């Protein structure tokens, strides 16, 4: 029998998506095949301390904060120099813990923006999902759109503002530019619709700008697209494949954080999408093209708008899509014939394959210094 792989699932973090990260991690831990994997959880509390939970059943039964308080979660630090045992106890014994592959499920700031990926690269650990560069590009929504537009990928138009930019007259200029008073003001580098606000008047615009700047130092303004919200899951490294699309049908004014996670009736999600074959294929191809354009690997969810005249527009790329029991990424693959346990197997395989390919690259270039 093959030796079990040690998988460390990372969750929590210091972003506004902390709680969603925990929900996603619980679903992953519950779904991973215990016959194949030894599973541990690395929980990052709000203030940034790291804890190891090496009994997955306790993680599933209790909140990780509860395990920290009662002492079941061990405080750890990062141990460089031995990639096979990257986690070191802070309890005084200095014990080190194994990881063959890390499954990051830390959404948002410091989880999806390349910071965590950079740490895992320094530890020389295989990890699931996009690398440092791709994570950073996709976290910055204006940068994502700049890259995609340069590559010919259709995107929703946008305008970026920083706190230094004068906002007087901006609303009217954008109204003239897009021909609509209905706009969205959103943080450049947050997800889950945190700090995303619809506006219809200049007063609402000014108020929304002030609110969003409480969360981010840059914001984007976009015209509101009255169309269908379609998503497509992408899986792979060099030769990615796309799932059947899914659709979000919000029951609120828009697909807000509350509609996503707090209101059980906030939206209907479906993988039975009424789209023509040609539009479906177009969405799948654009999703793959966008994935490649930003050099993603492992997984990503590409979010679209489809207008009433079937114009397909990319809204954003999510490199650590949710894995809760209602999340669309695993549901779209399930509908495409890939059950979640097999999906997780493939993601771990892809992470290890990429790491092995990276290890083949020459990292040292030795030359003899010319004598003077």
Swiss-Prot record:
Binding locations of Mg(2+) 1: 303, 316
Higher taxonomy: Bacteria, Pseudomonadati, Pseudomonadota, Gammaproteobacteria, Legionellales
Protein name, per record: D-alanine--D-alanine ligase
Function: Cell wall formation.
Cofactor notes: Binds 2 magnesium or manganese ions per subunit.
EC number(s) on file: 6.3.2.4
Domain of life of the organism encoding this protein: Bacteria
Positions bound to Mg(2+) 2: 316, 318
Stated family: Belongs to the D-alanine--D-alanine ligase family.
UniProt cross-references to PANTHER family, sorted A to Z: D-ALANINE--D-ALANINE LIGASE, D-ALANINE--D-ALANINE LIGASE A
BP GO annotations: cell wall organization; peptidoglycan biosynthetic process; regulation of cell shape
Residues given in the record as ATP binding sites: 176-231
Localization: Cytoplasm
ATP-grasp domain sequence ranges: 145-349
Family annotation (PROSITE patterns): ATP_GRASP, DALA_DALA_LIGASE_1, DALA_DALA_LIGASE_2
Molecular-function annotations in GO: ATP binding; D-alanine-D-alanine ligase activity; metal ion binding
Organism for this UniProt entry: Coxiella burnetii (strain RSA 331 / Henzerling II)
GO cellular component, one term: cytosol
Cofactors demanded by this protein: Mg(2+); Mn(2+)
Catalytic activity: 2 D-alanine + ATP = D-alanyl-D-alanine + ADP + phosphate + H(+)
EC primary class: ligase
Pathway: Cell wall biogenesis; peptidoglycan biosynthesis
SUPFAM superfamilies per UniProt: Glutathione synthetase ATP-binding domain-like, PreATP-grasp domain
Keywords for this protein: ATP-binding, Cell shape, Cell wall biogenesis/degradation, Cytoplasm, Ligase, Magnesium, Manganese, Metal-binding, Nucleotide-binding, Peptidoglycan synthesis
HAMAP family with a match to the protein in the record: Dala_Dala_lig (MF_00047)
InterPro entries, alphabetized: ATP-grasp (IPR011761), ATP_grasp_subdomain_1 (IPR013815), D-Ala_lig_Van_CS (IPR000291), D_ala_D_ala (IPR005905), Dala_Dala_lig_C (IPR011095), Dala_Dala_lig_N (IPR011127), PreATP-grasp_dom_sf (IPR016185)
């Amino acid at each position: 029998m093959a030796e079990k792989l040690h998988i460390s699932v990372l969750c929590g973090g210091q972003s506004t998506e902390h709680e969603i990260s925990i929900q996603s991690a619980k679903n992953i831990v519950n779904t991973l095949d215990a016959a194949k994997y030894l599973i541990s959880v690395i929980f990052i509390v709000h203030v940034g301390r790291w804890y190891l939970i090496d009994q997955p059943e306790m993680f599933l039964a209790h909140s990780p904060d509860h395990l920290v308080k009662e002492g079941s979660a061990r405080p750890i630090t990062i141990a460089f120099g031995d990639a096979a045992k990257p986690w070191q106890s802070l309890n005084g014994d200095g014990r080190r813990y194994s990881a063959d592959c890390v499954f990051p499920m830390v959404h948002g700031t410091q989880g999806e923006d390349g910071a965590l990926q950079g740490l895992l690269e320094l530890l020389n650990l295989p990890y699931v999902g996009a690398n440092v560069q791709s994570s950073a590009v996709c976290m910055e929504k204006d940068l994502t759109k700049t890259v995609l537009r340069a590559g010919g990928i259709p995107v929703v138009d946008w305008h970026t503002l920083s706190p230094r930019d004068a906002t007087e007259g901006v609303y009217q200029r954008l109204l003239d530019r897009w021909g609509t008073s209905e706009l969205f003001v959103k943080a450049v580098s947050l997800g889950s619709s945190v700090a995303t606000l619809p506006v219809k008047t200049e007063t609402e615009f000014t108020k929304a700008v002030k609110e969003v700047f409480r969360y981010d130092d840059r914001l984007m303004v976009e015209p509101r697209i009255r169309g269908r919200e379609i998503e497509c899951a992408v899986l792979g490294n060099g030769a990615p494949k796309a799932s059947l699309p899914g659709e979000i049908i919000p029951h609120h004014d828009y697909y807000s954080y509350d509609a996503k996670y707090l209101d059980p009736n906030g939206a209907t999600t479906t993988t039975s999408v009424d789209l023509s074959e040609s539009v479906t294929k177009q969405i799948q191809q654009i999703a793959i093209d966008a994935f490649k354009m930003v050099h993603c690997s492992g997984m990503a969810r590409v979010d679209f708008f489809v207008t009433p005249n079937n114009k397909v527009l990319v809204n954003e790329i999510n490199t650590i899509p949710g894995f809760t029991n209602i999340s669309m990424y695993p549901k779209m693959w399930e509908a495409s014939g890939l059950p979640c346990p097999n999906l997780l197997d493939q993601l771990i395989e892809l992470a290890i394959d990429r790491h092995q390919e990276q290890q083949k690259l020459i990292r040292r270039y030795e030359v003899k210094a010319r004598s003077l």
